Amino acid sequence: MAKAAAIGIDLGTTYSCVGVFQHGKVEIIANDQGNRTTPSYVAFTDTERLIGDAAKNQVALNPQNTVFDAKRLIGRKFGDPVVQSDMKHWPFQVINDGDKPKVQVSYKGETKAFYPEEISSMVLTKMKEIAEADLGYPVTNAVITVPAYFNDSQRQATKDAGVIAGLNVLRIINEPTRTIAYALDRTGKGERNVLIFDLGGGTFDVSILTIDDGIFEVKATAGDTTWVEDFDNRLVNHFVEEFKRKHKKDISQNKRAVRRLRTACERAKRTLSSSTQASLEIDSLFEGIDFYTSITRARFEELCSDLFRSTLEPVEKALRDAKLDKAQIHDLVLVGGSTRIPKVQKLLQDFFNGRDLNKSINPDEAVAYGAAVQAAILMGDKSENVQDLLLLDVAPLSLGLETPGGVMTALIKRNSTIPTKQTQIFTTYSDNQPGVLIQVYEGERAMTKDNNLLGRFELSGIPPAPGVPQIEVTFEIDANGILNVTATDKSTGKANKITITNDKGRLSKEEIERMVQEAEKYKAEDEVQRERVSAKNALESYALNMKSAVEDEGLKGKISEADKKKVLDKCQEVISWLDANTLAEKDEFEHKRKELEQVCNPIISGLYQGGGGPGPGGFGAQGPKGGSGSGPTIEEVD
C-alpha cells in the first residue's frame, strides 16, 4: 500500500474544508452530502450529536444546542471584549469557568459544558472522517491553518483541538500560506509581490508575499482581530426593524425566529453577489405572521458601507509594514467567501487604481489547498510540483520581555521571518540582586501592561555583584510559531527556560487526555446511533416494501387472500410498533425484522420462484445512505 497521505485542514469560523495532495495535484474532498465545504457546526439533541450539514440543517429547531463560531472563542479568556460582544449574538449559552469560556448545552437530557477546543475537535474529527471515507485508509497526519493574527494561546488551543480529534498535527500554519495554491498554478518566473485579501466568515486578514522561483517570503500581515462578519447581523437588524414597523412586534428575543431570519439573510447576501435584488419569504416567522420582503444590492451596500470601507485599513497597514507602494503589487488574490461581494471587489480595485483582481482560486477552498501542499512537503513528497517550494512565514506579533519601568523590550519584531532565534545580553537592575524574573510578552505597545503576558520564569543564584552579571536571553520561534525563551547567567553557566505552551488559558495534559477519551466515547456513541438508525430504516423499508408487494395489482390471483392478510397484518403491526418505539435499540429492530421475514419470506419467495423478482428481502432494506441518518434531513427555514 502507498504511504498514507497527510491532509490539509482549513478549520474555518463558519465552514471547514479538507484537501490532500496526491498524484502531483491537490484534491479538495467532498463530504457525504457532496459538498466541498462543511459547516463548522456541532449540534446536541436528546438522542445524538450531529456535526456539519446535519447540524446546520436543524439549527432553527434547536438553536440553544447548536454551536458554531467556536473559532471565535478558542484561546480567548471569558472576559475578552470579543467574547463578550459575540455572546450577544449567539443563541447558545457561554459560561465562565475560571475565566475560560465554555459552551453549555443540553445533550441526551443532561446539561454538558464543552471547551471551545472540544467543539473544534469535533469539527476536525468530521473533516478527518471525510478524508478517510475518500482515501479508504485511516488518516493521522494533518496541517491545520489559523488566521495570521492568531496569538500564541490561540495557536496552541487549535493544536490541542487537533490532538483531541486524534490527529498528529504536523504544523499549524498561517492561512496566507494558501497562496502556495496560487503559485502552483503560475508558470511565470521572476519576483512578484502578491497581496492576499482574505475576508471570511469570522476572520479578516491581509498578507503581502514576495514569490520568487518557488520561494515564498511573507513580507507583512495585518488583520482585524475583532472582525466578525457583521454583514449578516446588519441584514438581520434591518429586517427586525422592518418587521417591527410592519407588524408592531419585536422578534429580537425569539431565538428560533431570529435564527430562521439569519439563515434567510445569509442566503439573500449570497444572492446579492450575483443579482441586484433578493427576496425573503419566511412562512410563519413569528406568532403565525408570514414575512415576505426583498432587499436591493444598493440598500445592502448602504447598510454595510462603513464595514466595507474599514477593510482597506489593514491593506494600507500591510503595505506600510512591507515598505511597498501599492503600484509595486503585481497580483491581488481574493480569498474567503465574502470577497464575492461586488462592493468589496470594487473598493479594492479602485484602491489599486483599477488593477485586475485574481479570481482564479476558489475562495472557499484556497486555504485547504495550500494546507494540503504544506502537508505533502512536510511528509517529504518529492513531486516536482512541490519539491522546489519553500515558505518563509512570519511572526504575527512582536515578542519580548519586561525591563525596568514596565517597558516592553522586543527581541523578535513583528513580521520577522520564522523560524528565528534572537539573543540579547541584559544585566541586573539593582545591586546584590540574587535573581531575575523574566516576563515574556507579545504585542506592539510600548508598555508591557498593554501587551499580552505569555509566561514568566526566574533565574536565581546570581552572584551578588551590582550591574556586573551578564544574563543572556534567547528567544527562539520554531516553524509552528511556538516560542522557547532561555536565560543563562554567563558567569556561572546557570540557565533556565520556558516553552510558551501552557499559559493560563491553555488546557493541561490531563484535560487533553480526558477530552481525547471523551471524544472516543462520543464517536462510539455516534456509531451506535448510526447503526440503530440504519436498522430502524431497514426494518421500515422492508415492511413498506412487503406491504406494497402483496398489494400489487399484478399479483391478483397469485396470492391467496389468507396469505395476503397475514403479510398485511404483520406489516401493519410492525409499522405501528415502529411509530411507538422510535428510540428502540438496534437489536430490537433486527429482532422485529427477523419476525417479519419469517412471516413474509415463505409467501413472497413462493410467488417469485418462477421469475427473477426481488426475492426475499430484496426490496430496499438499506436505509438512507451517508449522514447521521436520524432526525430531519432538511428543515424548512423560509
UniProtKB/Swiss-Prot annotation:
Region (Substrate-binding domain (SBD)): 392-506
Lineage: superkingdom: Eukaryota
Species whose genome carries this gene: Chlorocebus aethiops (Green monkey)
Residue(s) carrying N-acetylalanine: 2
Name of the protein in its database record: Heat shock 70 kDa protein 1
Primary location: cytoplasm
Gene designation per UniProt: HSPA1
Keyword 4Fe-4S: no
Stretch list, region Nucleotide-binding domain (NBD): 2-384
Gene Ontology terms describing biological process: positive regulation of microtubule nucleation; protein refolding; regulation of mitotic spindle assembly
GO molecular function: ATP binding; ATP-dependent protein folding chaperone
Residues with PTM N6,N6-dimethyllysine: 558
Modified residues (N6-acetyllysine): 77, 108, 244, 346
Domains: entry comment: The N-terminal nucleotide binding domain (NBD) (also known as the ATPase domain) is responsible for binding and hydrolyzing ATP. The C-terminal substrate-binding domain (SBD) (also known as peptide-binding domain) binds to the client/substrate proteins. The two domains are allosterically coupled so that, when ATP is bound to the NBD, the SBD binds relatively weakly to clients. When ADP is bound in the NBD, a conformational change enhances the affinity of the SBD for client proteins.
PTM remark: In response to cellular stress, acetylated at Lys-77 by NA110 and then gradually deacetylated by HDAC4 at later stages. Acetylation enhances its chaperone activity and also determines whether it will function as a chaperone for protein refolding or degradation by controlling its binding to co-chaperones HOPX and STUB1. The acetylated form and the non-acetylated form bind to HOPX and STUB1 respectively. Acetylation also protects cells against various types of cellular stress.
